[in-house]
A protein has these predicted regions:
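Short, well-formed alpha-helical segments that are part of the catalytic scaffolds
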Residues: 10-28
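Short aromatic/hydrophobic "clamp" motif used to bind/position activated sugar donors
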Residues: 84
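Acidic helix N-cap motif at the loop->helix transition within catalytic regions
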Residues: 17-20, 41-50, 96
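A conserved acidic beta->alpha catalytic loop
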Residues: 25, 36-46, 64, 88-92
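Cell-envelope/extracellular polymer assembly enzymes that use nucleotide-activated donors
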Residues: 5-7, 31
Length: 299
């Protein structure tokens, strides 16, 4: 069996506190490429102190453009492996992920992307996302924020990535909103942009901006999981604005799209009188969450 070379591509800026954890979690990879986008802290010296021969730290060659896909593509272009694992400096891989990944890329010779299971460090939420990309197969990252692969192959997942949240992200609370706003200005009909920008305004309780964005998303999106999630966000917005009928209608639309959407079933219980709520909770207990975009309330 031909042994596939595995690269890891990390983009970073001012991650002196967390980048060691990220690197150590993938040190079994053949190559670790770190593209620095302008650090002014000790990130480089922390990396150098690890003294790992497979690590390549690249600085002063990339100008940050408020575009995560562009930076990830630049990092991938510096990799020499057959496959590339995309990792952020504040994230890390669970134990045994690299052996799982090696087995997967050997077993799926025709795949162009492979999903990883994505967990959150401080919550039980999870989802699956293509973090493994075959290099030189025409796959690129697209989207300045909440970027995605240009293609996505179906198949089993491999490895578990745990998302952290660095102080840099916490201190730059407007970054996502700023970049998503630029994406919306460039293409106001992109359903993915509408979804994520609407969700961002939902988090900020700016409902007057969130509602039209999410309503536009459910009208134009062809991705059913995205539409169902957008409907659920609309239901939550309507409910906190004392629009009970609209909330129930939006939540029901989410369930019409996917009757296995456990979070929507539980929220329908919240929206119902107790004698009906009992039934919704029973339905939720048997829901599989199949084809759900994000599993935020796992059993």
């Amino acid at each position: 069996m031909l042994l596939m070379k595995l690269s890891v591509a990390i983009i970073c800026k001012n991650e002196e506190k967390l980048i060691q954890r990220a690197i150590v979690s993938v040190q079994a990879a053949d190559e670790i490429v770190i593209l620095d986008t302008g650090s002014t802290d000790r990130t480089e010296s922390v990396v150098a102190a690890l003294n790992l021969p497979q690590v390549k730290f690249i600085k002063d060659s990339y100008v940050w453009k408020d575009d995560f896909a562009d930076a990830r593509n630049a990092a991938m272009d510096c990799c020499t492996g057959d496959w590339c694992l995309l990792l952020d400096a504040d994230d890390f891989m669970a134990a045994d992920s690299i052996p799982e990944i090696r087995a997967a890329i050997a077993a799926m010779p025709s795949a162009r992307t492979i999903d990883c299971k994505i967990l959150h460090e401080k919550s039980p939420d999870f989802y699956f996302y293509p973090k493994l990309i075959r290099l030189n197969a025409g796959v690129r990252m697209v989207g300045a924020c909440h970027e995605v692969t240009s293609v996505r192959d179906a198949g089993p997942h491999a490895g578990t990535m745990i998302l952290g949240y660095s102080e840099n992200h916490q201190n730059d609370t407007g970054r996502v909103l700023r970049i998503m706003g630029q994406m919306y200005a460039a293409d106001p009909t992109n359903s993915r942009t509408l979804y994520y920008l609407g969700r961002e305004h939902y988090y900020r309780k700016d409902d007057a901006k969130a509602i039209p964005l999410l309503e536009a998303c459910v009208k134009c999106s062809t991705f059913l999981a995205e539409r169902a999630d957008a409907y659920l966000y609309l239901a939550r917005i309507f409910w906190r604005n004392q629009r009970g009928c609209d909330a129930r209608a939006a939540c029901m639309n989410a369930l019409i799209i996917n009757a296995n959407f456990r979070e929507a079933l539980l929220f329908m219980a919240t929206l119902s009188f107790e004698h009906n709520a009992v039934r919704w909770r029973e339905f939720a207990a048997h829901a599989t969450n199949e084809r759900v975009l994000f599993v935020r309330n796992p059993p």
